[in-house]
Amino acid sequence: MAAAFAACMAMVAAFNHLPPKALPQIQAAEGGRNGIAHSNANGSVDYGVMQINSLWVPALAHSTGWTETAVRIHLMYDPCFNIAAAGAILRRNLIETHGDLRRALGVYHSHKPSLNQAYRTRETSAAVRMFTHPDPTLPPLPSAVLPPAPETQAPP
């Protein structure tokens, strides 16, 4: 993920009160890139970094006051707009799922249970790859920053 994407994702996550890792996880699972459109079997199209589905274009046009053509162009070529749209969609999904992040992430992909579950599995795999393997090029944290191990803590 490019640093510019990370900055947009952090800003959008904060604005929409989303967990900071949610948008990078979606991007990794979607595999989208700036300037890319992917045609789907159902005739819809997924646009840009976060693969925003064309079914969202009318709602985005209404909320921005832009034409649908302008929204499509921005979804394709403006990664921060694309990420902002993804954040708004995920926020809506969180409301719809009563705060259940895993379900909201699945609904980001599809409301169909089978597709939803498959996507959640793919998204979880992306999260594990992104967030559980430390970068071997980074130095370890100094021990003074880490709390003492539970067995060495003095009783109260």
Language model: regions and residue ranges:
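Gram-negative outer-membrane assembly/targeting C-terminal domains
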Residues: P147-A149, Q153
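Catalytic glycan-binding domains that act on GlcNAc-containing polysaccharides
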Residues: A2-P142, L146
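Short, solvent-exposed mixed-charge patches
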Residues: M1, A154-P156
